[in-house]
Each structure stands twice: as structure tokens, then as C-alpha cells.
Amino acid sequence: FFYISEEGCESCYLPYLKRMNLLSQKYGADKVIVLAHFTDKRNLEYLFSNNQIDLNIYVLHTTLDLFPKYNFYPILFFLSKNRYIENAFVADKSNLDLIDSYLEVVEHRFLKIN
């Protein structure tokens, strides 16, 4: 899952959306889901269409409050079979190298079919 908020910085989460889009194209749309806290759906649709991003999107009417300090940051995470959040990662444009490493681990450990 990838959580974004309209109150977050678009330049902060757009690089990650593009990377997630590539993973979705490579492994299937059912493997990558975006949870978006946007009150104006038109802005969200424009963001995705303008950047050729084709991901499953679920619009949230509230923030996730997973990590209240980071409600407006993009957050990547897995949902376990028991519906627990696992391997959460708070993304920021200051940690591009870390996001690349995180997505590489995601791809190798969770997405590749053996």
C-alpha cells in the first residue's frame, strides 16, 4: 500500500508514485494500491492522468493516523494476512536513496514470484 495526502507535498510523493506505477506494470495492478486522502477528487484524477499513473486508488475521507506526526507524508506499508501494518516506511524527498533501497527489497522479497 502507498498512502498519500493532498496536504502533502506533490514533489515529495510524485517520484514514489512513478516508481510504484512501474512496479504495478511489472507485477500486476493488484499488487500496488494507493490510499489517498484527497477531498477534491478532481485534483487527484488530474495528478494521476497528467503523470500517466495507472494504479488502484482508494480515496479516504480521513487521514490514517498511523503515525500522527507524519499524517501528511507519503507512507508505504504492507498489510499482513492478519491485517496488521508491516514494514512501514515514511517517505520524503530527502531520502530518495532509502526509498530506492526499500522498493528494491519490496520487489525482491514480496513481489517476485519464485
Language model features: what each stretch is:
Residues 1-20:
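Short active-site neighborhood of thiol/selenol oxidoreductases, capturing the structured segment around
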Residues 3-4, 35, 79:
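Short hydrophobic segments within beta-strands
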Residues 18-22, 62-65:
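A generic local structural motif
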Residues 24-27:
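Short, conserved loop/helix-junction motifs that constitute active-site signature segments
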Residues 32-39:
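Short internal beta-strands
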Residues 39-46:
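Short, charged/polar "capping" segments at the starts of alpha-helices
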Residues 46-79:
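Short, internal strand/loop/helix patches
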Residues 80-114:
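Thiol-/selenol-based redox modules, centered on thioredoxin-like
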